[in-house]
Amino acid sequence: MGKRLIVQRRGKGSPLYRSRPWLHPAPARYPPLTPVTLRGRVVELVHDPGRWVPLAHIVLENGDEFYIPAAEGMYVGQIIEIGPDARPVNGNILPVGKIPEGTQVYNIEIRPGDGGKLVRAYGTYAIILGRSGNKTIIQLPSGKVKEVPNDARATIGIVAGAGRLEKPLLKAGAAYYKWSAKPHVWPRVRGVAMNAVNHPHGGGSHQSPSFPTTVSRNAPPGRKVGHIAARSTGRRKR
């Protein structure tokens, strides 16, 4: 009798393949919208094993607390401003309609008050290109140009953690602990490298499926691997 495929084990929903909420200190989002400008202080920079970016724990003068992805150059004790009259300096949070053109921003809201949805990965930033009525035009890290409402908030600066990939892993054990904080399977073994009992492509004294890898969309779960319901495979003929 064969063994279950990884996709079948993942579908079961066991803890190995689920996100680990206890690793996340808190949601990284802006506080609710307010018409006034508030000052806050960065009380700590928190390591979040569930993401590649450190979080900045900020306490406002009215007592509210929140976490956001830290900006490059942000430090403990830094005073930040949040609101429509905040200055456009590194770490401050203000509506994109009040940010000068050419400024680098991150953690941008798509709708005012949603807490920040765009440009949150390490080392990324967007650029304010201009205005179009009640919309602000921004260029995302991918190069795509997008319009967001002028009231949508963003943080001035670049997301911290840009040098994450510069440190080599050196050994497989480091990669093991790196991926243990994520709901991923590591290492990822190819089907042709498995035994026949573990995968439809496994077995034999060769690493080849030995049969076409296209499979019907209606195939049973233990067989549904490879090119699922593929219209064509390989390079397109000219």
From Swiss-Prot:
GO biological process: cytoplasmic translation
Compositional bias ranges of the Polar residues kind: 206-217
Domain of life of the source: Archaea
Family classification: Belongs to the universal ribosomal protein uL2 family.
SUPFAM superfamilies per record: Nucleic acid-binding proteins (SSF50249), Translation proteins SH3-like domain (SSF50104)
GO cellular component: cytosolic large ribosomal subunit
Positions of region (Disordered): 198-238
PANTHER family referenced in this protein's UniProt entry, alphabetically: LARGE RIBOSOMAL SUBUNIT PROTEIN UL2 (PTHR13691:SF16), RIBOSOMAL PROTEIN L2 (PTHR13691)
Xref: HAMAP family: Ribosomal_uL2_A
Protein name (database record): Large ribosomal subunit protein uL2
